[in-house]
From Swiss-Prot:
Keywords annotated in UniProt: Cytoplasm, Protein biosynthesis
Family annotation (Gene3D superfamilies): 3.30.1360.40, Ribosome-recycling factor (1.10.132.20)
Main location, first listed in the record: cytoplasm
GO molecular function terms noted in the UniProt entry: ribosomal large subunit binding
HAMAP family, alphabetized: RRF
Purpose: Responsible for the release of ribosomes from messenger RNA at the termination of protein biosynthesis. May increase the efficiency of translation by recycling ribosomes from one round of translation to another.
A GO biological process held by the record: cytoplasmic translational termination
InterPro entries for this protein: Ribosome_recyc_fac (IPR002661), Ribosome_recyc_fac_dom (IPR023584), RRF_sf (IPR036191)
Protein known as: Ribosome-recycling factor
Cellular component aspect of the GO annotation: cytosol
This protein's encoding gene: frr
Subcellular location: Cytoplasm
Similarity section: Belongs to the RRF family.
């Protein structure tokens, strides 16, 4: 593996870490309605646990209400039960073939708990990014030791990987601040 391949590989893994952070934060409920928080819910579809997004369309009715419309009328009760039984503390109400999921306002205490969870997720992602940097640097050192790349190439690649790490950490901080602001906005 060359230095360029190591850099490309490390950059791709760092981007995946950022995407993973974004998707895990999307599941954290803020005061506003966001169909993304329902995506991890699985519905019993003819005996098979199936993601909600595959058995129903999700949309927003207004800023605090999510509309869930099952593709089959027979699935309304199962979808409603799956949402109610989830760990989100939501109380869906069916109106014919549409299920309305109102988002209750968060208490101040709950908002603070959620910001702690968000910070923790961010720190975990930063640790993952730093571990990727460490692995890449170790790989570069091995290549230098085996005389596959020069020390100058190693130093250049190490500097570029450090810049990628710094950029990823700044991006993580931006994502965290944005999510905290979203949670704390009443």
């Amino acid at each position: 593996m060359s230095a360029a391949e190591i850099k490309t590989n490390t950059d791709q893994k760092m981007q995946k870490s950022l995407e993973s952070l974004k998707s895990s934060l999307a599941k954290i409920r803020s005061g506003r309605a966001n169909p993304g928080i329902l995506e991890h819910i699985h519905v019993d579809y003819y005996g098979n646990p199936t993601p909600l997004s595959q058995v129903a369309s999700l949309g927003l009715a207004d800023a605090r209400t999510i509309n869930v419309q099952p593709f089959e009328k027979t699935m309304v009760a199962a979808v409603e039960k799956a949402i109610r039984d989830s760990d989100l503390g939501l109380n869906p109400a069916s109106q014919g073939t549409v299920i309305r999921v109102p988002m209750p306002a968060l208490t101040e205490e709950r908002r603070r708990e959620l910001t702690k969870v968000v910070k923790s997720e961010g720190e975990d992602t930063k640790i993952a990014v730093r571990n990727l940097r460490r692995d890449a640097n170790e790989h570069l050192k091995r290549l230098t030791k085996d005389k596959e790349i020069s020390e100058d190439e190693e130093r250049r690649a190490t500097d570029e990987i450090q810049k990628m790490t710094d950029k990823a950490v700044v991006d993580i901080d931006k994502i965290i601040v944005e999510k905290e602001k979203e949670i704390m906005t009443v």
